[in-house]
Amino acid sequence: MIETFTGTTEGPDAAALRERARLSFDLDVDICIVGAGLAGLTVALEASRMGASVAVLEGRHVGWNASGHQLGTVMPGFGLPVGELIERIGFEDTKALWDLSKEGAAYVRANATEENIPGIALSEGALEVSNVDVGDQLISRLQMLAGDFETEVEGWQIDRVRSELKTDRYFHGVYFPRAFQIDGRKYVHGLAAMARRCGARIFEDTPVVSIDPSGIRKRIVTPSARLRASHIVLAGNIHLGAPLRRLSETLLPVWRYAGVTAPLGEQLAEAVGFRGSVTDTDGIDHFRIIEGDRLMWASPETTWAARPQRFAGAIARRIRTIFPKLGPVEISDTFGGAIGQTVHGMPQIGQLRKGLWVASGFGRQGLNTSAMAGQLIARSILWGDERWRLFSPFELVWAGGATGRVAGYVVGLWGRGSAAAAGALARHRERAQIQERVREARLAEANRQAGTRPAVRRPPPGQPPPRPVRPPRQPPPAKQASQAYPEPMPQAYQEPTPHDYQEQPLTRQEATQADQAQPHPEPPVPAGHREGEEAWRQG
């Protein structure tokens, strides 16, 4: 396994680097830039193109720990979400800042050509995926980016995302067709070569010992020479050193490490069909395919430095978790670097005092925002462009020192844990919904085969079941014509009422019939009459 710390001077292009030049003599220039990273080299290139004399002082070598050089994704935006930007500075200023970030991305694309930088390996498209089901949020975000901020985006539903990425870990996605990827190592050295061709002078292994920003001509002291300039641009990020320690302490150092797998062959194409870069909304996963069949994967951020080799096992396990079809993968190369993260999440771009400029704190969006900052500062110095004042609301805030690093580490752990829990819950709900649909389909098929009516859908938990609807009463069947003596219809029993028990007057006919039906006993005969009658019968 190859292990590097920054990745900018290791690898196949390391032998092509020229011999470093140190500043060993006094020098007067128009602009002195401290730091040969992405922002500093962009200022040098633009100012040299405009005719200014430029000197770049780098304490180590070109591109050492340059932010944004790892996976090389270039797209508009900042570390702070758009919604939070609008809440803080309003819609109009947010729109202006977004346009500046788009200009920065376009600037990188214009420079990253095979003519300017051979082997830059530009690839198109970036996909941002969600770990949970966010259908409604996806629609609102698409409307904001496409309508309000005039950015070309596409919304991908779950089926589309999973057709490109064979995993159930991701749900919806936002596709940026105008985003692209470049080889960050080659780009930072390509910027240096372009700046030299335009007349800029770059001195490596030349740390700054002290800076005196007072007066019209500022003074910079190095171990072996002195330099004077009308403008000083501080583009060293978290590595400005002792002379500007207070400025460095406004940035929280954040390390991120990446690994490159050994060639995976055709099985990589079966698991990952998308050829651009992929990042999740929680900032945990960031990967893309390089060299056709190798996977470059970045680890989560941490506020503590470590050897990149320590993260090889974690990266391999993460790849296997997301794409089980790949099985165990071998990490053949690891590298890493540090970025400066501000407390408010926005870059530090502006003028600290007359002639003293700062460009740092680019966070995760290093490539487009550093290009934007370099253009703004160079044009402000030489052309009077005042658009850098859009960043005035984002002041220099102390990052908390060691306490801030501990807090940042804890917040990062909490964020990753929360994202993992939310993702697991979302996948559980999805599996439950699939099982419910399968059960209903089986029940419907059974009802169809049995000839019964479909089953009533069960109500959600907490709701009472619907009351059954009684079928209408069917009318009695019609009598058949051949039935000569139909049976009498049974009469339903009715409860008698008090009226039924009252005596009703009889008609004359009813009274006669009743009298004839009753027996009439003979009237009683007196005793003397009875004896005479018996004697008469005997005689």
Predicted regions and their residues:
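Helical element adjacent to the flavin cofactor pocket in flavoenzyme catalytic cores
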Residues: F171-S230
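Glycine-rich FAD pyrophosphate-binding loop
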Residues: R49-H69
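Glycine-rich active-site loop/strand segments that organize a redox cofactor
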Residues: H69-L100
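N-terminal Rossmann-like FAD-binding beta1-loop-alpha1 element of flavoenzymes
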Residues: I31-V56
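Flavin (FAD/FMN) cofactor-binding and adjacent substrate-gating region
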Residues: I2-P12, L80-I86, A110-G190
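Active-site substrate-recognition segment that forms the wall
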Residues: A106, E114-L122, V208, R226-Q267, ...
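C-terminal catalytic lobe of FAD-dependent flavoproteins
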Residues: T281, A305-R307, A312-R317, T321-H428
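Extreme N-terminal leader/targeting segments of oxidoreductases
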Residues: M1-I31
